[in-house]
Amino acid sequence: MAQKTSGLIQRCRFLLLMILFLPHVMTSSVLSVNGKTENYILDTEPGLQESLKCAVQNHIRDEELLWYREDGRVDLKSGNKINSSSVCVSGISEDDNGITFTCKLQRNQSVSISVVLNVTFPPLLSGNDFQTAEEGSDVKLVCNVKSNPQAQMMWYKNNGILNLENHHQIQQTSEYFQLSITKVKKSDNGTYSCIANSLIETKTKDFHLIVKDKGSTVPIEPIIAACVVVFLTLVFGVIARRKRIMKLCRKDQGPQCRTAL
C-alpha cells in the first residue's frame, strides 16, 4: 500500500512539473507587424506615409522591442518600446524603394520580423539635351532612367524607330540606357528620343545631336617656328639700322669755332 501511495505521489509531482513548464514551452514569443507574423513586402508610392506597428504575441512578461532601418537602429521614445512599438515612414520617395525595416526582441534579437518597402513610380529620365560633335568623332547619348517596376526602353530618331547601323551600339543597365555612335556622319544629325514604357506610364526624353563639318587640321609647330623667324629678323633689322644711324651721326660731328663780329 505504501509503495502504491509513493508511486502516486511521484506521478502527481511529474504532472505538476509538466503543468508548470507547459506555458514556457507553448507560449514562445512571436512578433507581428501590422497583424502579419511573416516577413512581407509593403507596396507604397512616393509622397505617402506608412505606419508599421510591431507587437509581441504569446508573451508571459513585458518585452522590449527594437526597430532597425537597414542596419541603423531607430531611436524610440520610452513609451514606444514595451510589447508594442510603432514607427511612421513619412514623405516616402523613390529612394526609399527596397528599404528594409526590422523589428526585434531586445532580449533575443534572433526573434525578428522584417518589412521591405516596394515604392512604385513612373520612369524618371534625365540626360544632356544637346550635343555637338565633329564629323568622324564618337558620341554617347546617355539616358539616365529610374523606374519601378522596370521599364522597357527604346531609342527613336526623328519620331521613328531607330534603325541600328554598324556604327550604332546600345547598352542598358538598371540605371541608364545608352546609345553609342562611332565616327558620326552628317546623316546622324537629328533628334533622338529615349522612350521608357512601364506598367504605370510611358515617358520620353529628347536628345538633339548636331554634327559639324570636320575642321581642317593646321600644324601648330611650323606656325610657331615661322613666327620666331619673323621676330628674330625684325630684331636684327632694328639693331642693324640703329648702328648705321649712329655711324652717320659721328661723321657729321666736327670741331666747332666761335666767330666774333
Swiss-Prot record:
Protein name, as recorded: Transmembrane and immunoglobulin domain-containing protein 1
Ranges facing Cytoplasmic side: 241-261
Post-translational modification: N-glycosylated.
Pfam family, one: I-set
Species this chain originates from: Bos taurus
Extracellular side: 28-219
Signal peptide: 1-27
Localization annotation: Cell membrane; Cytoplasm
Transmembrane segments: 220-240
